[in-house]
Every structure is written in structure tokens, then in C-alpha cells.
Amino acid sequence: MPHSTAYVVTDRPERYIRQLVSHMGHKAETVLGGDGRAVIELRSGRCVLRPCPGGFEMIATAAAEEALLGVRDVVTRHLLRFATQEELVVDWSPPVGGDTAWALSPVVDDYLLTHCSPVDEVLRDLVVRTREETGGAAGMQVSHDEGALLTMLARMSGARLALEVGVFTGYSSICIARGLPPDGRLLACDVSREWTSIARNYWERAGVADRIDLRIGPALETLRALPAEPVVGFAFIDADKESYPDYYEEVVTRLTPGGLVVLDNVFLGGRVFDPAFQDEAQVAVRGLNETIARDSRVESVMLPVRDGVTIARRVG
């Protein structure tokens, strides 16, 4: 399901959200929460509004891109009618294709995110910067709830050496590094200097740059250069799907007893469920899902978090 976001700068976010809910109530189903968050549900799609420091965020979703553009237009036009005392700028991100098996109800999504540990200013700024710099590719960034899960799992694993295969702009790197002990180290693998150059600044701001060792180049080469023994306590795989089976094998053989490997996008937008989908990535991930379920070296669970997350724990 395609979606698009906009951040509106204002010192009166609650006022604008209340006005939108009140004014659009005659043509849409609206819900205003006690914490100032709101959902506007139109026939063509939905828009969730969330107060943030310095303004508010709008997240529009719809079944198709044309409908999404309509939702954005309706909400923007109504919002600007109220801006008589200041000039509001509503800059929507490009529509991001729905690479998830299903989209959560905005009410459920909003409730879920509200009841996770709150996102901080560094991660919030990184989300905005990623959207500005990468456009439609911003959909590759992990969500706040998934990032919170990574921090918790990394901390629970007790890992001193962690691996990340696929860095993008560094959001997940921050989350993992924050879960490591002070002497912990994250070996982060990616092939893009452009996207990881964004990451470095935010690693510094988050105070975790000294824990992250970025390796630019094919991840398989980096993994195979590691000692062929149990040295890794935590790993996160979120890179090219065609290579998932190879990444998993190189990682799992190096996991310490009790170590965790987490794999993102194991649903591939629901395409792994249907064997009619047979491109290289779909075949690779579908096959790996079966492999992990039967792998006696690990105990695993697959969770319906966003586009599917598998957590496997090394036994023995």
C-alpha cells in the first residue's frame, strides 16, 4: 500500500490538527485522540496526524498511488485554509510503494508507535534527511517499532560483536549500537558510499560512532574474512534479497551459543506466500524461510512486524 509523509513546521500543531478533524468531519470519518493525534479516513484513503516537537507529521496511505495523491491534495487544501496567520509549507515525500504484506490500520499503527519507547530527535531528524536525500528509496529505512525491537534484541543478546548486512542511511545501525555494551562493536556492511555518508553524521550525533566499524564493499567478502568460529552475538540482515541464503549461512556459523540473527522483509510484500512469484529474490527468500524453519542449529520465530521479521537463536 503506497504511502507518503509530510512534516509541517508550526508552533501550533494541536490547533491545526483539531481544526482539520472538525472541518473534515462532514466528509470523512475522523478520530481525535486525547494525546492530540488524529486519523482522517476518506473513501479513497487515510491520513494520520501526529504532533511532534516544532510541528506535526502527516502520513497518508491509500490502495493505489492515484488515490494517495487525492488524499494528500484534500488534506493539504483543507489545512491551508486555516493558515491565515502564518505561511505553512506542506512538502509531501514522493509516494513509497507498498512493499509490505498488508498495511496496519492507521489507528492500530498510531497506537503501536505511541506505546513503544519514544523516538528521539536524532532518529527523527535522520528520517527527514533520508526522505529528502533518497526520495522513494526511503522506504528501505526500518520503522520506529522495528528499530526499537532491534535495540531490545541486541541488548538482550549481550553481544559484544554485532553484524549488520545492509546499512542504508544508518537508522538500524544506531538502534543496534545502542543495544550494545560500552565495549561492544558493530561491524556494518554496505556497498553505497553515498547513502552511508548520511549515516556517519547521525552516528556521531547519537554518540555511537565509536562502536561502528563501517565496511564498504561486498558483504559476503567481509563476512568470509571473519574468523570461522563463534564470535558474533547479534546480526541483522537487511540487504539484497537474492543473497539472503548466503548471508544467513555465513552468519549462523559464526553465532555464539544463544546468539541472534534477525532477518528483515521475509514476507517480500506477501509474494513469498505464492509460489507463482518466481523472480530470484522471491525464490531466495522463500527458500531461506523454509531452511530456517528446519535448521537444527537454531530455534526461530517469524513475526508479522512490518514486512515480516525472522528471529533465529543459535542453540548448543
Spans of model-derived segments:
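Short glycine-/aliphatic-rich beta-strand segments at the starts of folded cytosolic domains
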Residues: M1-Q19
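Short beta-strand-to-loop capping motifs
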Residues: V8-T10, A60-A63, T114-V119, R314
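Short, intrinsically disordered, mixed-charge
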Residues: S22-E29, D73-T84, R294
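N-terminal intrinsically disordered, cationic/polar leader segments
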Residues: G25-V31, R37, R43-R46, R50-A63, ...
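C-terminal structural segments of small proteins and small subunits
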Residues: A60-D99
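N-terminal auxiliary segments of SAM/dcSAM-dependent transferases
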Residues: S93-L123
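Conserved SAM-binding loop and adjacent beta-strand
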Residues: A101-W102, C116-D120, G135-L149, R155
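S-adenosylmethionine/decaboxylated-SAM
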Residues: H144-G316
